[in-house]
């Protein structure tokens, strides 16, 4: 059944947004809409839809901020292991390349992935998000690594096809800890907790590798890293 029918009525929707003074709009591209099987043939109708949508945004004076992945992994890829499988990285790289190349003239602001922990740790460790699995720490850590590789491939695609002025970054849901008091001990404890909760992702991106503290903590459950992974 139809709901808001944005697929057919986006131009009306954007007119309403413009009338409210909205000048920026964050949206997500649906991976399965462009590649229904995840790594098969590109669906030209899907790409054409997003071109129409983005052109409409520009007509209404609204700047798009485009997210490449917001949790809608193609089911065919999930059935082959999902984020636990290295093949998902290869499929995402192709998706990112085709999407950025096909839409670069209409987009200047790109977001690679939305909230990595939600589709890795919560999805494959805690099990309260799709696909609802409860795997070992080693498997969860490998999903982190695969997500980081996808971030790297998306950044590379934007650098290759985005053109002058293109920007790209990650949306991450960091955990924040505030010290109870401003004593040196509490401040140090808050910093240590922040590092414990965040550096396996943010540290890996900014330091081009996993921190020694993280590797020592996880031990044998550390993700498998192949040569060149952190060269993206």
Across the structure, where does each feature detected by a protein language model lie?
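N-terminal structural segment of carbohydrate-active enzymes
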Residues: 1-43, 47, 53-56, 60
